[in-house]
């Protein structure tokens, strides 16, 4: 079952109703944010009209997968017959004919806690100590039978150890031959070879970073999106999740920060990388907001309460600029 993104954004209920109306097993899905939007936008009255019991494969890919989103979606729609084991985290890209890893089918998603401090140095520790700051990753499944996956150092082209983050390289029958009439880019992207091993395969360089654990692929982020602050690697989705989970009101009211409407990125100022965090907040909160910069740069630091909340969860540095915007601005 397929639907245009515009039609979905107009009415997330429309997507679920189309699934409900199919008289047979349904395989369809979307990125993580699609499930988050369904949780927040579909009403109880609309849920009462849905039968999602035949939704056998609910694929989730194209962006970082959040286990909390999967759990929230199940809790929100279990009354419609939706099954938790229908969730199907997967990984793919157009150059690999969309599907590279996924599943297993009819089983709960697999997740893993790693040491958040060590991954900033591209080191994977799947047994973090009790006092370590942890990061939860959802597996994107096992490689398809015809696919070969290597985790490779993008600078040396040598295969990484099992405890290192590297670039995801893919080889297999479903990988495209190259880009039409772009020979130089085709050679750079589709004809990569692993150095130091006997392997005649040509590999597709995905530009995505990750690692393999127990034959499950974990995607940590995209190489071009990495924010490098003081020699440490920070993934924008981690910063965005931290800000989304922060509560500037200290529990007094519903958090004004809109989940999923936060953007973290870096800019260069005087050849130095600076972190910028932009967040959509409730319009009423924006009027009295003192913890954010309102769409303009400032030398002042963010409020320490909000900053400390973020530090406890993930961040090891202060944002250089925090921007607050009204709804639908980001």
Task: Give short role names for the model-derived ranges.
Residues 33-36, 63, 174:
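Alpha-helix/helix-capping structural signal
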Residues 16, 24-29, 41-134, 148, ...:
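Gly/Ser/Thr-rich phosphate-binding loop
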Residues 1-19, 235-239:
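ATP-dependent adenylate-forming carboxylate-activation enzymes
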Residues 174-175, 189, 216-244, 281-320:
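Adenylate-forming
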Residues 5-8, 24-28, 59-66, 138-139, ...:
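Hydrophobic alpha-helical scaffolding
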Residues 137-150, 154-163, 167-229, 233:
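Conserved ATP-binding/catalytic segment of the ANL
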